[in-house]
Every structure is written in C-alpha cells, then in structure tokens.
C-alpha cells in the first residue's frame, strides 16, 4: 500500500548520485538525505600502485541515500534506482528496505504521513 511509510536506503558509487537524484525526482521523490560513506562488499577493496609500490585500499568511497516514502510506491523507487545504478559490475551497490513506524516533524509536531509531505 502506498500510504505505508517505508525507509529506503541505497548504497552505491559516488559517480551515480546525480543521475539517481534526477531519476528519483522525476518519479516524485523530493526529499532525501545523502551521506558520503566508506565500505566494501564482494570487491574487498582495490589494489593501487604509487611510485612502484602496490598497496590496498580496504574501504571504498560510496554514497548512501536515505528516504522515507509513503505516496510513491516502493517498487517504483526500487525499479528507478536499479535502472540507473545497475552496470552488472561488482560495486553497483545495495538497496535496503524497512518499515517505518513513526515520523515526527520537529518544527511543526506533525506526525507520520503529514510530516513527510
């Protein structure tokens, strides 16, 4: 149901952020929080060379985008993100989806759906 509140967290390459923001805005997502984060998954970091010496970077720079939706269907957000982010390569990212039981807008005291609009 579209009126349920759902948190969607997307962790992906920094280079995909602008395209993702644009695509999400086109389907009605007009609020999100963005973090620069470090992490790794299957790729386990990368090997680099500097002045002939090889070294490993264990934590890779990523971007984490969070949003709580109640009017835009979760499947629309996921499908949009997948179409923008998927390259078929390791490092495309992850999408986490979880229910939200309560939202409170601090400025007005509005709660739940009204706090998100």
Q: What does each model-found stretch correspond to?
A:
Residues 1-117:
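Positively charged, small/polar-rich N-terminal and surface patches that mediate targeting and assembly
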């Amino acid at each position: 149901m579209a009126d349920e509140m759902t948190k969607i967290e997307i962790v992906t390459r920094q280079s995909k952020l602008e395209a993702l923001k644009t695509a999400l805005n086109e389907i009605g997502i007009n609020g999100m929080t963005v973090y620069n984060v470090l992490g790794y998954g299957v790729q386990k970091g990368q090997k680099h060379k500097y002045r002939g010496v090889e070294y490993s970077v264990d934590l890779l720079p990523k971007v984490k985008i969070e949003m709580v939706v109640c009017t835009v269907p979760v499947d629309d957000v996921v499908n949009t993100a997948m179409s923008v982010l998927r390259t078929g390569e390791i490092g495309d990212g992850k999408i986490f989806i979880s229910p939200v039981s309560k939202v409170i807008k601090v400025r007005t005291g509005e709660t739940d759906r009204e706090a998100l609009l």
